[in-house]
């Protein structure tokens, strides 16, 4: 593929572990202070974390603030359709072992959120930043990242996002403008491989692809891709480095991975490390090996990065356990067919299941994606459909042959489920709203 492997140990430690920060000009400093004040006011008024409004104010006063705040830092941009927030937290845990960092832990992943994260840590020499895939090109041009992490590319928010192939093409053009950037990319996702193109510093990772519904045909030429196994499941749960490949007659093919998973260990040609991820499911093994490869690319020694990944158990409320009366809720997020494909390996039969679907702007108004989720695999457990689009979800569950109840209000839906363990899977705004309601409920009781 014309790429150069970056060694597991990353760049020379002396060059990487002591990044130098440039001093900001007085106008940028004033813009940052105005943004911080706006964020503080937002929090004081109970309007949220303030990261979006704070970044927006800073950018309104200085449209070059993102570039100026990033200058002199070792910046890692983490992007893709699914797994950004989790992988971002895993990389941040590893990078913290070598120095302070800026980190958009809340998941505010567009320009205003990125500016706010950088402004909150003005002296940090590192930045580990989640970026919405639609905004990756513009943010990469502004910050000139040391590392770009590309997890996967699938359909999401059909009314907001353009066609996946167009997103991949935009990313490919952006990466071509940054030839010195290390691109840590998922070799198992044909759309990602197409997006990386001929980037000269690619590190390929066998991170898995639980959903390939958007790439039955080649992203480049449109011909049918050939997979070496019938169920086209590759990566952590399958063929490791090279047993389960894909290719097209045009020449686009799965690159030979530089990192892969074998018997629960992260492997390179010269590295073998236990991959101790405390997040559930095969999908998080893939996120873990992506995080480890990325941390090494920014200069963290592999044997120092790997143990740090164990620190991550909850990610912005995801995977958290919440006790509510006699129920124990496990909070999970899935927002598109690819996310659900990975989630199915995490759900524990016959644990009762609450599925909550909204369709606001942040979720995407179009819920037709529900028909691509294999809900048929959720049989033999109590299921309740909830959320603002509970009726749409209920229709899909009926066609899947699942006995279920439809209860629009999530708290009322929980009351319809038995005591004990309950898995809760919600899309973005439904997940956020339920967390807030449960928090207010606990505060009122205690």
Residue ranges and their predicted role:
Residues 1-51, 55, 71, 222, ...:
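ATP-dependent carboxylate-amine ligase
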Residues 9, 13-24, 203-337:
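Adenine nucleotide phosphate-binding catalytic loops in nucleotide-utilizing enzymes
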Residues 10-12, 16-206, 211-216:
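Phosphate-binding loop of NTP-binding sites
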Residues 83, 132-134, 153-156, 188-190, ...:
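Short glycine-rich anion-binding loops that position phosphate/pyrophosphate groups of nucleotides
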Residues 88-92, 292, 394, 435:
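A generic structural signal for short, well-ordered alpha-helical segments in conserved domains
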Residues 91, 95, 114-118, 288-298, ...:
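Buried hydrophobic packing segments
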Residues 118, 164-165, 214-225, 416-423:
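Short, surface-exposed amphipathic charged segments that create phosphate/polyanion-binding patches used
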Residues 130, 151, 184, 287, ...:
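Residue-level signal for inorganic ion chemistry
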């Amino acid at each position: 593929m014309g790429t150069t492997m970056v060694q597991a140990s990353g760049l020379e430690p002396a060059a990487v572990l002591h990044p130098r920060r440039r001093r900001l000009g007085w106008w940028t400093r004033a813009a940052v202070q105005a943004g911080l004040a706006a964020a503080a006011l937002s929090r004081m008024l109970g309007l949220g974390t303030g990261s979006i409004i704070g970044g927006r104010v800073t950018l309104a006063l200085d449209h070059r603030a993102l570039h100026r705040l990033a200058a002199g830092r070792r910046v890692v941009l983490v992007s893709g359709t699914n797994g950004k927030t989790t992988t971002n937290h895993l990389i941040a845990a590893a990078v913290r072992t070598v120095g302070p960092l800026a980190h958009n832990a809340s998941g505010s992943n567009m320009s205003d959120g990125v500016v706010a994260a950088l402004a909150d840590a003005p002296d940090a020499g590192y930045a580990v930043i989640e970026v919405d895939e639609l905004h990756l090109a513009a943010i990469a041009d502004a910050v000139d990242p040391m590392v770009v992490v590309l997890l996967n590319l699938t359909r999401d928010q059909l009314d907001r996002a353009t066609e996946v192939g167009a997103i991949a093409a935009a990313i490919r053009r952006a990466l071509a403008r940054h030839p010195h950037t290390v691109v840590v990319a998922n070799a198992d996702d044909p759309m990602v491989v197409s997006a990386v193109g001929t980037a000269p510093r690619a590190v390929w990772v066998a991170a898995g692809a639980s959903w390939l519904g958007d790439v039955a045909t080649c992203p480049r030429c449109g011909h049918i891709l050939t997979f070496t196994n019938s169920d086209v499941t590759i990566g952590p749960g399958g063929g490791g480095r090279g047993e389960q490949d894909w290719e097209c007659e045009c020449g686009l093919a799965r690159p030979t991975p530089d990192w892969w998973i074998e018997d629960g260990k992260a492997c390179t040609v010269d590295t073998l490390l236990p991959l101790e991820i405390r997040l559930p499911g095969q999908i998080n093994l893939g996120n873990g090996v992506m995080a480890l490869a990325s941390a090494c690319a920014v200069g963290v020694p592999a044997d120092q990065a790997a143990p740090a990944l164990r620190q991550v158990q909850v990610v912005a409320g995801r995977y958290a356990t919440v006790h509510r009366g006699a129920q124990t809720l496990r909070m999970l997020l899935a927002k598109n067919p690819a996310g659900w494909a990975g989630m199915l390996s995490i759900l524990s039969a016959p644990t009762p299941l609450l599925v909550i679907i909204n369709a606001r702007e942040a979720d995407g108004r179009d819920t037709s994606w529900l028909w691509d989720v294999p809900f048929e695999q959720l049989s033999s457990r109590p299921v309740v459909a909830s959320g603002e689009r509970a009726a749409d979800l209920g229709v899909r569950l009926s066609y899947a042959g699942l006995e279920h109840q439809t209860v629009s209000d999530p708290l009322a839906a929980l009351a319809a489920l038995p005591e004990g363990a309950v898995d809760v899977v919600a899309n973005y705004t439904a997940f956020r709203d339920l967390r807030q309601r449960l928090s207010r409920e606990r505060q009122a009781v205690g």
